């Protein structure tokens, strides 16, 4: 391991011990904001500190075993010491790989909630139906993770599914898990309306954007925001379509449009829509895409054309293929039931490998 990395890890251990002590300080305990901030830092440092201490311990074990091997004369003792050396060496290699991953640059948005948007692309009614299938897939995954998924806006398809559905997902590390889902998702299957049994191909777009904290870097002039109301079209019992409680906000300079019809209260919908609007505009600013907030969605998902797919769901073959990492799994039924960890873990490993390559080449 490089000496510079050892130094950084030792510094992190020192900081971990410092933060641990601060969390017992009465002045910190009485300051809710400071205590919360240090608790998050303590949690972030705990795993890497523990792993680094175990790594150092394994190095010590290896060195002790090597010293004993040199002194040993008994063949059985030599064999036992060599086994200990080999075991310690394997452990060190595994832990060094894990430490390298943990030291990679972190996306500050990985732990925040996310807006998940699904839109029907090419394929007409079948694309809308598949949008509904994707929504239920993510909904079940969110439930399995203990996350909360809220539907903010939904435009239902004529024969089921959704032409568009926008949700907010909150919980632990939501954006970090879902951010690789952005792109065109292609489906190949025989529609229920197909009498000849022919396989049809259609597509949906998925966009995942972090819910960034509102700060002073985004200042919206109220005169630049057009406020419209309309009647909710989704679930809501007897109150649906009786009042104009749904809200649409348009940021005129960028053309950014957001809608929210989750609540029966127009006031609550407006507050949520404003949060969505600021999040979108702030993310555009962070990525230096000042032309319009819609640019970020095009970068994330493409145009919705089947040729721009990131993933294909082939129902006749029970197959899912992620084209970015050449991963094919023959368990489509369980995937559509929300079994996404194998896919998401593989995408994360590929991302980490790319980061390590870029850091190594820097």
From Swiss-Prot:
| Keywords from the named record | Cytoplasm, Methylation, Protein biosynthesis
Superkingdom, natural source: Bacteria
Transmembrane stretches, start-end: none
Recount the PTM note: Methylated by PrmC. Methylation increases the termination efficiency of RF1.
Gene3D superfamilies in the cross-refs: 3.30.160.20, 3.30.70.1660, 6.10.140.1950
Q: Name one GO molecular function term.
A: translation release factor activity, codon specific
Modification N5-methylglutamine occurs at: 238
Keyword Aminoacyl-tRNA synthetase recorded: no
UniProt GO cellular component terms: cytoplasm
Q: Does the keyword Protein biosynthesis apply?
A: yes
Q: What is its subcellular localisation?
A: Cytoplasm
The similarity comment for this entry is: Belongs to the prokaryotic/mitochondrial release factor family.
Q: What does this protein do?
A: Peptide chain release factor 1 directs the termination of translation in response to the peptide chain termination codons UAG and UAA.
**Name this protein carries in UniProt:** Peptide chain release factor 1
The species this protein belongs to is Psychrobacter arcticus (strain DSM 17307 / VKM B-2377 / 273-4)
Which lineage do the record's taxonomy fields give for this organism?
Bacteria, Pseudomonadati, Pseudomonadota, Gammaproteobacteria, Moraxellales
